[in-house]
């Protein structure tokens, strides 16, 4: 289909039995079941291929995606990362480029809050370390949303002058700049304080509402361009 063969030793998985790969792919995500979520991530079909093939190829990744294999396999730990979020934080831009060109969402979110639609994207992880500016540059070049709000934006969280410059050159704004540009109400979570303590459910709901307000304003502005 892509002019490549899964049996070509150049692109082969590091597994003896190719039939096992075929069966695993037909079952979508996992090579084998495991209780530990980090092992599940490592053994998710696409990630297994990217990390273990002698010469991973984006066309083979597309082949797997078109047959149901998925990138959205999240660690069930504190951060809800996929391996791609780990790569972004660790400056693994080569693996990220391979995955995104193979069909992964350049704005893939964590599952820090599984109930929210506004978790941090790959770009947030990239800009959180000054040394990972090459990942930041790659994600921007591949179309990452530089103004996605959670309700903070990547520019709010960015560390290092190169990350900040890359974001600003791409049109990134802080959440406060977005608020002022579109004349939106100021962030105010004071109502989430009850008897001197923060009600986390109320705060999470307010974060989602305010995130939607910011993101909708950006989206509407883009649509009217």
Locations of regions flagged by a protein language model:
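Ankyrin repeat A-helix N-terminal signature
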Residues: 16-20, 48-57, 86-92, 117, ...
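Alpha-helix initiation and capping sites
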Residues: 8, 23-27, 38-42, 54-57, ...
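Ankyrin-repeat-protein effector appendages
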Residues: 142, 159-225
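Ankyrin-repeat inter-repeat connecting loop/turn
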Residues: 6, 39, 71-73, 106, ...
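Ankyrin-repeat boundary/"N-cap" motif
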Residues: 8-15, 39-51, 73-84, 109-125, ...
């Amino acid at each position: 289909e892509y002019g490549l063969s899964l049996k070509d030793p150049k692109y082969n998985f590091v597994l003896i039995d190719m039939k096992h790969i075929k069966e695993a792919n037909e079952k979508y995500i996992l090579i084998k079941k495991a209780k530990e979520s980090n092992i599940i991530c490592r053994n998710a079909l696409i990630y297994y291929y990217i990390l273990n093939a002698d010469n991973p190829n984006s066309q083979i990744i597309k082949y797997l995606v078109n047959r149901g294999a998925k990138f959205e396999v999240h660690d069930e730990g504190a951060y809800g990362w996929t391996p791609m979020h780990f790569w972004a934080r660790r400056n693994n831009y080569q693996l990220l480029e391979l995955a995104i060109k193979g069909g992964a969402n350049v704005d893939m979110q964590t599952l820090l809050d599984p109930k929210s639609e506004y978790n941090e994207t790959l770009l947030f992880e990239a800009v959180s370390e000054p040394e990972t500016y090459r990942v930041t540059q790659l994600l921007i070049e591949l179309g990452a949303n530089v103004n996605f709000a959670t309700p903070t934006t990547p520019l709010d969280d960015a560390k290092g002058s190169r990350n900040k410059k890359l974001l600003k050159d791409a049109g990134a704004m802080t959440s406060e700049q977005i608020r002022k540009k579109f004349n939106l109400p100021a962030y105010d979570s004071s109502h989430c304080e009850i008897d001197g303590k923060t009600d986390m459910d109320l705060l999470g709901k307010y974060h989602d509402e305010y995130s939607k307000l910011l993101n909708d304003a950006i989206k509407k502005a883009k649509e009217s361009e």
